[in-house]
Amino acid sequence: MKEHSIDIQLSHPDDLFHLFGSNERHLRLMEEELDVVIHARTEIVQVLGEEAACEEARQVIQALMVLVNRGMTVGTPDVVTAISMVKNDEIDKFVALYEEEIIKDNTGKPIRVKTLGQKLYVDSVKQHDVTFGIGPAGTGKTFLAVTLAVTALKRGQVKRIILTRPAVEAGESLGFLPGDLKEKVDPYLRPVYDALYQILGKDQTTRLMEREIIEIAPLAYMRGRTLEDAFVILDEAQNTTIMQMKMFLTRLGFNSKMIVNGDISQIDLPRNVKSGLIDAQEKLKNIHQIDFVHFSAKDVVRHPVVAQIIRAYEPAPVKNEEREEVQEEIE
């Protein structure tokens, strides 16, 4: 097939650095993911390759240049998102992701959605009392949930944040680990702590936890409570039983929001126990103030190979097939 060539005119020589990053790491990423060769010289970017691939590269570069011209810093996640969107014929929606800033992190860096799935998730949380975020790791579910909770707290929309998860892990018997239940579960809540530290900083997070404005606790600690004026997040919800999920959801009080996050491809419950997350999808789908947002490999904002790994496991994971047979027997 004949090699195609496209020249893209930039506004300023400095645009090359802002667009392609230090050591041209973004340029190499585009070349690898789009199967093109890119030559960057002063204010001209030349793209070589098959015509369709060159056109995709042109669209990615022009979309990223909109951010550069607005004075935004283009990072690797932005390039990954643009590449993913052009491959899914969604590049025309790329710039819209950057129109709204959710909040600034501890260093003053704006936090925005990175994919269309994330935007749908954020909009759903704003519009519903209970939002389920279901999808693979790397799609930003936990980080976005914590971001939205902190935003609501800072705006005075809620008085506290409660973060919880079930105490079930594959290959770990918590009963044989030292410490009480909270101490046993804390290491598994690391992604939640990481998100809080990035958004609030470690010192402020610690102060808010000491004042019990932020509470991080195992799911078992939710029993018997009514959670009012609170933003409540349940992570790793695929590992709840049906009764645990019912118990959690019925804790919802007035002026509260709930987010339930999980990945139904990573269930660690015993084979004969049905996941409360799967059950909730079936039973609650027609309730007006409850919404389900499904993420896919398209929403992965980690290294591009992670999305490829997720896709490789999506068609027919053995674990899921076995589980579906068991679920049918249970029902």
What does each model-found stretch correspond to?
Residues 87-109, 113-116:
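Conserved loop-to-helix interface motifs that mediate assembly, gating, or partner/ligand docking
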